[in-house]
Amino acid sequence: MQDSGFKKKDRSTNIPQEQFVYTRGGEHKVMKKVVNSVLASALAITVAPMAFAAEDTTTAPKMDAAMEKTVKRLEALGLVAGYGNGDFGADKTITRAEFATLIVRARGLEQGAKLAQFNTTYTDVRSTDWFAGFVNVASGEEIVKGFPDKSFKPQNQVTYAEAVTMIVRALGYEPSVRGVWPNSMISKGSELNIAKGINNPNMQQFAATIFKMLDNALRVKLMEQIEYGTDIRLNVTDETLLTKYLKVTVRDMDWAHEKGNNSDELPLVTNVPAIGLGSLKANEVTLNGKDADLGSNTTYKVAEGINPNAFDGQKVQVWIKDDRENVIVWMEGSEDEDVVMDRVSALYLKGKAFTDDIVKDLSKSDLDDVKIEMDGSEKSYRLTEDTKITYNFTRFNDPVDALSKIYKDNDTFGVKVVLNDNNEVAYLHIIDDQTIDKSVKGVKYGSKVISKIDADKKKITNLDNSKFSDLEDQDEGKDFLVFLDGQPAKLGDLKESDVYSVYYADGDKDKYLVFANRNVAEGKVEKVVSRNKTDIRLTVGGKTYKVYPDASYSENANKDVKKVNSDLDLISNLDGEEVKLLLDPSGRVRHIETKDAIDDRKPLAIITKGATYNSSKDTYDFTVMTQKGKTQIVSLDQKDIYDRYGVNYDKSNDKRQAFEKDLVELLQPKVVKEDSATDANQTVLLEVNFDSKGEVDKVKVLDSKLKYSEKSTWDKLADEDDDVVGDYEVTDKTAVFKMTGDLTPATGTKRGELKNAGTAKFKDVAKKSDLKVWYSVDEDKGEVQAIFVVDGSGLGGDHQFGMVKQYGTASKQDTITIVTKDGDSVTEKEYKLDGDADDLKVDQDIRRGDVISFTLNSDGEVIVDDVVEVVNNNHIDNTASKSATLMPEDERQKAGIDKLVVARVDEVDGNTISLNYADGKTQKYYTKASTAFIDVYDGLEGIDGVDEGDYIVMIDSADIDGTRFDYVLVVSSDDEIRTQHISTKAVTDFLNKPTRLCTKSWRWGRSSHGTKVNTVNDEAVVDGIVTLPADASVRNFNIAFDQEINSKDATVTVTNEDTLGNVTVSEVATDAKVLSFKTAKLDTTKTYIITVKGLKDKNGKAVKDVTLYVEFVAGV
């Protein structure tokens, strides 16, 4: 079957702390969401220097990223040198002598300072002072003038007024200054944008402030005096300190906007080290600057502090130092070019999502009709035939090949989009920053977590004990580059617990790019949310982090590292635990560290399926339900099963008590509904011990002293207000089990089984007067140990309906978030569960987007045992098993449903919805002001109503008065059907659902070999074959599964849909993966429902019940 295309992304899958970044000319604009990826860090757009605003404070400015770039730029220009260890003293004050030195260098007079060393001008400047020549030159150029006493006071800390005065003089603007010093100079400095908002001009200035002022002055146009005497004439030239004195070629926005130039003529970055390693060194970049008179594809060195990889595919502003090997000392993006950093959501051709067929036929002529949709901003951008595409640092000559590869990988990878003047994509760079444990040479290695780094041997050892040794014979800077948190680094800078991935420059298997990040979140887990098996989230410190299904974890300081492997129980048990989360560049959890074992609890449990001895493993296998409502299959050696005295059942144990029963007999479910002391003592209460993997490693049979009570006596004995049963206290550790289901006793080799076991709240059990109850007590503590409800019903309230949004864990209790009706509105509510979430997620396969019927107990908790899936899957899909499926008609009463209608909306008029059925008939149905409208396929939220062309499911609740519909669920729309290429058959199958009891029809023909069919409603079923024997007196059925099955306890029912009469079934058998059976002769003009229950896999685990709709069509 054709793939339906780029999957529509769930917009709410983005982590809350993420953001979408839009950039124009280096200025970051934070929009809706964040993209913390290798792309956003390694290729991030640099921030343009901001005009400095000094504050009235004595706190030194911090050496932030912007200041660091300023200082690196001044260093590259030869203006500042620092202390040789990367420290430029930005947090220190600066003297008058030091500042005079900076100004002389900025005027290009450093060589003259050497000659002026002995031309002393001031009384306090000696020729032996290191700064003497600079002060003397500054004095000669009238940049400094000293004090009336002929001193210079070189060691005084320079004030803003003094510094701005020297700068204004150096720029030639002193003749234009009018007024009294220092205000006159401060005013002129502000006019020239040297600095703004200085509150205290007499306060000493830190070096960072001075550096910023000097940096701002570099691009100010110089003034020169062309007439002297009484007729003074001044002229502002086209020269600056950069161009006239420092010999710098300037190609920036000022240049682009003067002399008829424009920003399109700025140089284009055509190659960077992260892509062209081998042809480029780590500190080089290639520019196409033909229109800027810089030549075509010229390679330049870049000064320290410039990351050229940030500008690949962009127009850039540059300052090039002409007398130093053409070194670029400053680089920023063009202010007239839009750059978007986001994530890929989908690709479209002429409005339709990419599919296998579209990609197969895609050609370069189609590119003008291709759009790429962003996941964060939800905006789309059109490609052109000239769009350049890079994927994982590999350039593609043919953009069609690139798009095919990106579509095949199909994920929300990080993306950098450079737009042209028409808002079309000029350049596209996409990076897979989310795949973990990948190892494809020439594509990607990782992500991994570092355990040990050996920089000398160039070897990285990972937490999982694997090693990356490919760098051993390579030269750093030539054969491989290292980036840490997006900035160029050295291999020796990496540390234990860094998360890293390795890419390959332009796909070259011998050129490596090591990208590492050091992003850690630590603290107590406040909440655990599970939307599905691949979408699990932890909230720590108020921020929510998504956990990779294959993330690793350790409970003992990384001595033992294991995989999460989508173990929802494992993650749920992190609730309330202190954790350390190692995040990858996209902000997702790559590794989890805990201080203690994730689950060291010992819950109480009852047996729901009796023990059997497994001779092949020498274990006793049985099933229990814990007090949390979790069903657990147990398989233990007898030495791991203990009696009430703490003595195990090992055969060699000579301490075994003679009166202890055989284990198979002992470990059977027992339900006694009358007051019988003998029988009551047979009820087994267990204490179950879980290991660090969440598996049962020990079970203890408890010494339970059971008491019996029933009906009104129980109602008086149990007090929900005081939490007592008679004289015994009910605590938060008291287990309450519902054991009202059918019990099949153990007979011979057949195991006993308790159906529909569950858990309940004491408050619900205590207020009922129609129950039969056993309870066990701890006499020493005066507490109720466990309560067993063996007869009675009605522990829940009215049925409600809603769409599952996600699962979670809070305060050590599983939760479920449901979009549901709340009065006259629709809201998103988080409910606590009275049992285990796995009973819904795993046993019933209820997932995000599914619609359920549920009831609440007196504590407002969802009663797990009462949850019924009403609509499975939240959209119409070409694959039947993935398309919206309704619950069987005969189960709707149990779910509290009076009516269930499926149709396409033909017309909406107020509270009247006209529905167009598949056969063309139209019928009107009515809603009301309180009707809940829920979008279950796209927004996953409440909406105001429905529109023409919507595909809907309407529910009338039996527990809400009136005949108008109470819930309307939108599962698709005409627009969605079109863009996602949904077939007419899939739509027709959906519209036919009200007349079906299941999701798939088998069509049988009068051929002797039978007819294969595709997947039915359960994904475990692969196909089925109906064959017609020669005598035509019976029908042979074969149902094939994708796993080995056991039909020993299975029941097969074949029912005539019209008469609801059952057909005789015989010879039910299993051969590996195939279930076969025979029926009596069937009427080929009728339709039949086949129901298979009680199937198990080869390990004895229950397989979901199967319902098939069989239609006989002659001649097929």
Curated annotation (Swiss-Prot):
Residues 1-53 form the signal peptide. Keywords: Cell wall, Repeat, S-layer, Secreted, Signal. Disulfide bonds: none annotated. Residues 54-117, 118-181, 182-231 form the SLH domain. It is found in: Secreted, Cell wall, S-layer. PROSITE patterns: SLH. This is Surface layer protein. It comes from Brevibacillus choshinensis.
